[in-house]
Amino acid sequence: MREVISIHIGQAGVQIGNACWELYCLEHGIQPDGQMPSDKSLGGSDDSFSTFFSETGSGRHVPRAVMVDLEPTVIDEIRTGTYRSLFHPEQLITGKEDAANNYARGHYTIGKEIIDLTLDRIRRLADNCTGLQGFLVFHSFGGGTGSGFTSLLMERLSVDYGKKAKLEFSIYPAPQVSTAVVEPYNSILTTHTTLEHSDCSFMVDNEAIYDICRRNLDIERPSYTNLNRLIGQIVSSITASLRFDGALNVDLTEFQTNLVPYPRIHFPLATFSPVISAEKAYHEQLSVAEITNMCFEPHNQMVKCDPRHGKYMAVCLLFRGDVVPKDVNAAIATIKTKRSIQFVDWCPTGFKVGINYQPPTVVPGGDLAKVPRAVCMLSNTTAIAEAWARLDHKFDLMYAKRAFVHWYVGEGMEEGEFSEAREDLAALEKDYEEVGVDSMEDNGEEGDEY
């Protein structure tokens, strides 16, 4: 089997973890106590779920996951919540004091105390796998644990499991709303440290998801639960190919092969459609062409940036439900003709398609409508550089005054790390810029389009 281990770090990672595992359980017919009612196990020969769940002797299904936080409150909610008997107590790891939004605490002082325990638990999960294909790491950029501890763990995973794929789902600080003043510092430090250890990083920004909840689901004041369930749908779409059999199956390494043209350019933009409330879905049936089209609308994206200003390097369309290749091909053809979608000139084709016949599942009583088909688009576009530029600018404003820096230095970090990280991100922006520039071999013919 090709197992995948999920690692959920810090408050954001753990709460997204809750949403994801809730959804996986519904999709696979696993009850909150880990039992799978017998009719399923008799009728379906489909055991693809074992990439994400391991089965115990007593017939319980345990997620291949670890949840880590440097303070206990968030994970305590799992220990007392609906899914308390789904996880093995050893999979829920908590420290005693939090990282206080400080990368240095998560990476050096507090994180150090818990890293070996965490790696030990991950090792146990890995030993339980027959053919581990890699790790999914969920965290935020802005928090202390999410930034500092994640980068520490990624470094150690690279040492212990060199060639295994590591994919991240990262919550990027929203442009307007902020949960911590020092988010730009944490984000840039963690990106710099993790850049060489991560194979592919799907970024999600809270503000973009707030807007989607407001606009598409008419939720006046979205809560984290609303946001996380939507993120859960995206994660589920991306991992569906690992958990179900489909016509065109995609595994972890296949994502990288198709989405990452250069090792550093590994931040695809995720878009999911249709995000639609039950009342609306009752009145409209969305075709493959329509949902595919919706993916190219900037307001359906999970990060605020405008692909119309950038160029696409690769696009991966993951369909689920009632979808046939003929419709997909037609939809893509239409988009290619009528859209102002620009591909970089060195990557002319650029569409990869995956189809899974398992229809999308929704949490009962949630905000999302049950739809017969959905699509998740992962696109590697140069426009995401806007997000880095935004963050770098905020970093510069604070760092010019050395604001808050003493908190980091006081936890054993050197000030040089700030400038080193900032230079690395400047280089990353430059990389994106260069990828988008047309190749030199234009003999003047293509130059007339602009």
From Swiss-Prot:
<keyword id="KW-0342">GTP-binding</keyword>
<dbReference type="GO" id="GO:0005874">
    <property type="term" value="C:microtubule"/>
</dbReference>
<dbReference type="GO" id="GO:0005525">
    <property type="term" value="F:GTP binding"/>
</dbReference>
<dbReference type="InterPro" id="IPR036525">
    <property type="entry name" value="Tubulin/FtsZ_GTPase_sf"/>
</dbReference>
<feature type="binding site">
    <location>
        <position position="11"/>
    </location>
    <ligand>
        <name>GTP</name>
    </ligand>
</feature>
<feature type="binding site">
    <location>
        <position position="145"/>
    </location>
    <ligand>
        <name>GTP</name>
    </ligand>
</feature>
<feature type="binding site">
    <location>
        <position position="140"/>
    </location>
    <ligand>
        <name>GTP</name>
    </ligand>
</feature>
<feature type="binding site">
    <location>
        <position position="206"/>
    </location>
    <ligand>
        <name>GTP</name>
    </ligand>
</feature>
<dbReference type="InterPro" id="IPR023123">
    <property type="entry name" value="Tubulin_C"/>
</dbReference>
<keyword id="KW-0378">Hydrolase</keyword>
<dbReference type="GO" id="GO:0009612">
    <property type="term" value="P:response to mechanical stimulus"/>
</dbReference>
<keyword id="KW-0460">Magnesium</keyword>
<protein>
    <recommendedName>
        <fullName>Tubulin alpha-3 chain</fullName>
        <ecNumber>3.6.5.-</ecNumber>
    </recommendedName>
</protein>
<dbReference type="Pfam" id="PF03953">
    <property type="entry name" value="Tubulin_C"/>
</dbReference>
<comment type="similarity">
    <text>Belongs to the tubulin family.</text>
</comment>
<dbReference type="GO" id="GO:0046872">
    <property type="term" value="F:metal ion binding"/>
</dbReference>
<dbReference type="InterPro" id="IPR017975">
    <property type="entry name" value="Tubulin_CS"/>
</dbReference>
<dbReference type="GO" id="GO:0007638">
    <property type="term" value="P:mechanosensory behavior"/>
</dbReference>
<feature type="binding site">
    <location>
        <position position="71"/>
    </location>
    <ligand>
        <name>Mg(2+)</name>
    </ligand>
</feature>
<dbReference type="GO" id="GO:1905792">
    <property type="term" value="P:positive regulation of mechanosensory behavior"/>
</dbReference>
<dbReference type="GO" id="GO:0005737">
    <property type="term" value="C:cytoplasm"/>
</dbReference>
<dbReference type="GO" id="GO:0000278">
    <property type="term" value="P:mitotic cell cycle"/>
</dbReference>
<feature type="active site">
    <location>
        <position position="254"/>
    </location>
</feature>
<dbReference type="GO" id="GO:0007017">
    <property type="term" value="P:microtubule-based process"/>
</dbReference>
<dbReference type="InterPro" id="IPR003008">
    <property type="entry name" value="Tubulin_FtsZ_GTPase"/>
</dbReference>
<dbReference type="GO" id="GO:1905789">
    <property type="term" value="P:positive regulation of detection of mechanical stimulus involved in sensory perception of touch"/>
</dbReference>
<dbReference type="GO" id="GO:0016787">
    <property type="term" value="F:hydrolase activity"/>
</dbReference>
<dbReference type="GO" id="GO:0043025">
    <property type="term" value="C:neuronal cell body"/>
</dbReference>
<dbReference type="InterPro" id="IPR000217">
    <property type="entry name" value="Tubulin"/>
</dbReference>
<dbReference type="GO" id="GO:0030424">
    <property type="term" value="C:axon"/>
</dbReference>
<feature type="binding site">
    <location>
        <position position="71"/>
    </location>
    <ligand>
        <name>GTP</name>
    </ligand>
</feature>
<keyword id="KW-0479">Metal-binding</keyword>
<dbReference type="Pfam" id="PF00091">
    <property type="entry name" value="Tubulin"/>
</dbReference>
<feature type="site" description="Involved in polymerization">
    <location>
        <position position="450"/>
    </location>
</feature>
<feature type="modified residue" description="N6-acetyllysine">
    <location>
        <position position="40"/>
    </location>
</feature>
<keyword id="KW-0547">Nucleotide-binding</keyword>
<dbReference type="InterPro" id="IPR008280">
    <property type="entry name" value="Tub_FtsZ_C"/>
</dbReference>
<dbReference type="InterPro" id="IPR037103">
    <property type="entry name" value="Tubulin/FtsZ-like_C"/>
</dbReference>
<comment type="function">
    <text>Tubulin is the major constituent of microtubules, a cylinder consisting of laterally associated linear protofilaments composed of alpha- and beta-tubulin heterodimers. Microtubules grow by the addition of GTP-tubulin dimers to the microtubule end, where a stabilizing cap forms. Below the cap, tubulin dimers are in GDP-bound state, owing to GTPase activity of alpha-tubulin. Component of the large-diameter neuronal microtubules which contains 15 protofilaments. Plays a role in mechanosensory transduction (touch sensitivity).</text>
</comment>
<feature type="binding site">
    <location>
        <position position="144"/>
    </location>
    <ligand>
        <name>GTP</name>
    </ligand>
</feature>
<keyword id="KW-0007">Acetylation</keyword>
<dbReference type="GO" id="GO:0000226">
    <property type="term" value="P:microtubule cytoskeleton organization"/>
</dbReference>
